Amino acid sequence: MSESPDLSQIAPTLKAEILAEALPYIRQYHGKTVVIKYGGNAMTEERLKQGFARDVILLKLVGINPVIVHGGGPQIDQALKKIGKQGTFIQGMRVTDEETMEVVEWVLGGEVQQDIVTLINHFGGHAVGLTGKDGGLIHARKLLMPDRDNPGQYIDIGQVGEVEAINPAVVKALQDDAFIPVISPIGFGEDGLSYNINADLVAGKLAVVLNAEKLVMMTNIPGVMDKEGTLLTDLSAREIDALFADGTISGGMLPKISSALDAAKSGVRSVHIIDGRIEHSVLLEILTEQPFGTMIRSH
């Protein structure tokens, strides 16, 4: 992948054109909420981490309200490895026993979240970290995974949850006070247990509840790819169903695309899957005309 251009080497007239191109998008999204699922290489490479932090701050400064939901799979895997555990996945979901849940809470709600918050604040933003347990944000219930080999049967994958309800009051309060919420996808159940929830699913549900104008999901590939490796730039619900059926969409992309499609069907006006390995990909998607990643449509 080529390095991003040095802005100091760009001609002043071109810089002006870039800024002018952003104006209609700033107007369109001014005062609106944009939910960003932050994950993949963008969370682990220092250059990309810093670029993301600056992007989010810029969005806030021009009147757009970013809400970040982060993952942390590689960091969880690394922490599990240190205690001699191997991560196991079924249909893109992490099997989470009690010991793994303790690691997930520590890594997501501590190390990863605070790294994001610290970096945003370092560059002049005002970020606040939350888990879904804070302020009663995410009510969860145990997820029972359908067994594809045995119709009607379910697989118990431990303390893995699905979103039962979202109470957005704490997020809205932070937005009203000009803070940037950074949310770890950990919910609480009526049984008193903590639940590990797929970050893509949380981002999609949160976008709907917050009446977000846009949902952006960052990943480590250019977008949704066909079996030949060609980027699919625009997908309807019918096309997505076909890609599920023939196995083109599989593994970790299953919950991501399902969540994106559900959000589009539930009223989120613009839903995109983008390549987080590209520096400033969030700004490119939101504030320019450049086609980027895969757009998910409800029809």
Swiss-Prot record:
Substrate binds at residues 72-73, 94, 196. The keyword tRNA-binding does not apply. Signal peptide: none annotated. GO terms for molecular function: acetylglutamate kinase activity; ATP binding. It catalyses: N-acetyl-L-glutamate + ATP = N-acetyl-L-glutamyl 5-phosphate + ADP. It is an enzyme of class 2 (transferase). The keyword Amino-acid biosynthesis applies. Pathway: Amino-acid biosynthesis; L-arginine biosynthesis; N(2)-acetyl-L-ornithine from L-glutamate: step 2/4. It is found in: Cytoplasm. Its EC number is 2.7.2.8. Belongs to the acetylglutamate kinase family. ArgB subfamily. PANTHER family: N-ACETYLGLUTAMATE SYNTHASE (PTHR23342), N-ACETYLGLUTAMATE SYNTHASE, MITOCHONDRIAL (PTHR23342:SF0). Catalyzes the ATP-dependent phosphorylation of N-acetyl-L-glutamate. This is Acetylglutamate kinase.
